[in-house]
From Swiss-Prot:
Residues 1-14 are cytoplasmic. One of its GO terms (molecular function) is metal ion binding. It comes from Rhodoblastus acidophilus. This is Light-harvesting protein B-800/820 alpha chain. Its main location: membrane. One of its GO terms (biological process) is photosynthesis, light reaction. It comes from the Bacteria. InterPro entries: Antenna_a/b, Antenna_alpha, Antenna_alpha_CS, Light-harvesting_complex. It is found in: Cell inner membrane. The chain crosses the membrane at residues 15-35.
Amino acid sequence: MNQGKIWTVVPPAFGLPLMLGAVAITALLVHAAVLTHTTWYAAFLQGGVKKAA
């Protein structure tokens, strides 16, 4: 691990939850942006348009 010295500045008990929280928030923001700025994603989640038989 080439970034191992970061734990001499920031303790792991503070840094790990901070990093994991930042990753989770970023993922939620990306998903929210996709949901609100596309027209196809909601239809994809609903399974698309059903064709009449």
